[in-house]
Swiss-Prot record:
InterPro entries reported in the protein's UniProt record: NusB-like_sf, NusB_fam, NusB_RsmB_TIM44
GO annotation, biological process: DNA-templated transcription termination; transcription antitermination
Keyword Heme: no
Keyword vocabulary terms for this entry: RNA-binding, Transcription, Transcription antitermination, Transcription regulation
GO molecular function, a single term: RNA binding
Record gene name: nusB
Pfam (any one): NusB
Protein name: Transcription antitermination protein NusB
Species of the source: Xylella fastidiosa (strain 9a5c)
């Protein structure tokens, strides 16, 4: 597969993961989690809708499905892990930032294969793209403190 500039294959990590495709999967997962939060839909229906409607855009479909199913399945636990680092209740956090935080918390807890810095950076970039003007700074602060608690050895190592 060639990159957008036509200059050869897209860069991949040693494990074969294409970071650009993962980023796209995260953006689509954000949209799915946001839709779920707003509609209260069933997890399988939300995933099926986004996987079907945007199949050509969800480049890493397996990762997209893992993120969405993971957040929807573990939502109460993720909220509990985030709560000590919030300055308000999780329900009072803007819906986009709430979805970004839940996705970030899921990756920090359950996707140890993804470095914490990547999780935080991707969350910041997603919040900048979809969130409020300063939402990305809030996301950064919350996830930075959560990472210290959830991945202390990695963060301090």
């Amino acid at each position: 597969m060639s990159n957008a500039s036509g200059g050869g294959p897209r860069p991949r990590r040693r494990d074969g993961v294409d970071p650009a495709l993962r980023s796209r999967a995260r953006r689509r997962a954000l949209q799915a989690v946001y839709a779920w939060q707003i509609s209260g839909g069933v997890a399988k229906q939300v995933i099926a809708h986004f996987a079907h409607e945007q199949a050509y855009e969800v480049a890493d479909l397996a990762y997209f499905e893992d993120l969405v199913e993971g957040v929807l399945t573990h939502c109460a636990e993720l909220d509990e892990k985030l709560t000590p680092y919030l300055d308000r209740t999780i329900e009072e956090v803007d819906a986009i930032e709430r979805a970004v935080l839940r996705l970030g918390a899921y990756e920090l807890l359950y996707r140890q294969d993804v470095p914490y810095r990547v999780v935080i950076n991707e969350a910041i970039m997603t919040a900048k793209r979809f969130g409020s003007k300063y939402g990305h700074t809030y996301v950064n602060g919350v996830l930075d403190r959560a990472a210290l608690a959830l991945r202390k050895v990695e963060v301090l190592g």
